[in-house]
């Protein structure tokens, strides 16, 4: 079954082939501050480029994903990309 490609890690087949996704490896290798900075940096990247690409909706989804993961990591919750999908009610304005 082919999933709808919303641009997030939850449905990217190339990530599912590995035992761990890159985000999980980084979580284990980085300090908490480094990891939070990585998540925040990716949020900013996708927010800034979304209006200049053909895949605006995908970049918006990716930005939401990184913002949501940021809130989890800040609470010391281990991110499992397939499990931790962004809830529809998640609000990330003023997050940082």
What are these regions (language model features)?
Residues 1-96:
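Intrinsically disordered, low-complexity regulatory regions
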């Amino acid at each position: 079954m082919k999933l709808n490609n919303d641009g997030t890690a939850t449905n990217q087949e190339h990530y599912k082939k590995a035992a761990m996704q890159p985000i999980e490896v980084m979580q284990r290798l980085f300090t908490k501050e480094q990891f939070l900075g990585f998540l925040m940096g990716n949020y900013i990247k996708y927010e800034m480029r979304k209006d200049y690409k053909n895949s605006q909706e995908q970049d918006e989804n990716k930005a939401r994903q990184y913002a949501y993961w940021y809130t989890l990591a800040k609470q010391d919750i281990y991110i499992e990309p397939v499990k931790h999908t962004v809830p529809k009610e998640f609000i990330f304005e003023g997050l940082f």
